[in-house]
Regions:
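ATP-binding pocket architecture of kinase catalytic cores
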Residues: 1-40
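Gram-positive cell-envelope targeting signals
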Residues: 2, 26-29, 70, 75, ...
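Active-site acidic catalytic loop and adjacent metal/ATP-binding pocket
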Residues: 93-144
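Helix N-cap / loop-to-helix initiation motif
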Residues: 177-181
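ATP/Mg2+ or Mg2+-diphosphate-binding catalytic cores
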Residues: 195-243
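Active-site activation/catalytic loop segments of kinase-like enzymes and analogous catalytic loops
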Residues: 143-176, 189-208
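ATP-dependent phospho-/nucleotidyl transfer catalytic cores
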Residues: 8-13, 38-109, 166, 216-217, ...
């Protein structure tokens, strides 16, 4: 059975709607945790964050491009950027190996919770949020949903640290967070997600003609890297327990 909602996508620059989306995520996670604990505890938990596999895929793309001669603009830029981003991936792999298994945040996860999955419905007097796009719904660490929402939303707002902390504090009003949870989110964010996805896009796309947009995307990733690292530096020293 399908349900249809008369609404629009959440305004990714509208702070009020962002906070409504966080409240909605809290409700989703509470329900998802209860169902998993009381009904589906024996169901398989998805591997939390397969960094090792992703790193292998990035290395495979690197090895493929290394053999190309002559190299086109995207391929040359990729080879220049690869050592920096691959090192980030390896650091994340080592950090992941040292993390504990099951977390108190285990439960059903949305999988792709961002502004495209949140509809603002109703009128100004009777507004409500609807959640869509459950294709990647699974059992896992629900903090991955929170991280994904933070990353997508913060990057659309110029890597604003104040917005990131506002999201964390709003989430904590409904589901308590500890310092280790902030460290976990920070660890997820350190992975070079955009570079990894672009490498996959290259590998799965046409090699006959590489779109100029690929070069634009890679340049943008490198240009935004300083903002990302500044944000992560602030997040790593952020104390959630004092909020």
């Amino acid at each position: 059975m399908r349900m249809f909602f008369d609404g629009r996508e959440m305004g990714v620059s509208n702070k009020n709607e962002i906070m409504l989306a966080v409240d909605n995520l809290v409700a989703l996670h509470r329900a998802g945790r209860t169902v998993w604990q009381e009904v589906d505890r024996d169901m398989q938990i998805r591997e939390k964050n397969d960094v090792k596999r992703r790193n292998r895929e990035m290395k495979r793309v690197h090895n493929y491009i290394a053999k190309q001669s002559p190299k086109r603009e995207f391929e040359s830029l990729f080879m220049q950027a690869f050592p920096y981003f691959y090192e980030q991936g390896l650091n994340c792999e080592q950090a992941e190996a040292g993390t504990a298994g099951e977390s108190e945040h285990m439960g059903y996860c949305h999988g792709t919770y961002n502004h495209h999955s949140v509809l603002v419905c109703g009128t100004a007097d009777a507004r409500y949020i609807a959640t869509i796009n459950f294709e990647k719904y699974h059992i896992g660490n629900q903090l991955q949903d929170l991280y994904y929402f933070i990353r997508k939303t913060v990057e659309k707002n110029g890597y604003a640290f104040a917005l990131l902390t506002a999201i964390l504090e709003r989430y904590q009003q409904g589901i308590p967070l500890q310092q280790m949870d902030v460290a976990y989110i920070c660890g997820l964010y350190r992975y070079p997600e955009k570079f990894y996805k672009l490498s996959n896009q290259y590998m799965n796309g046409s090699k006959t003609r590489i779109s100029p947009k690929m070069v634009e995307k890679l340049n943008r990733i490198m240009e935004e890297e300083e903002k990302k690292q500044t944000l992560l530096e602030k997040l790593s020293s952020y104390n959630i327990s004092k909020k």
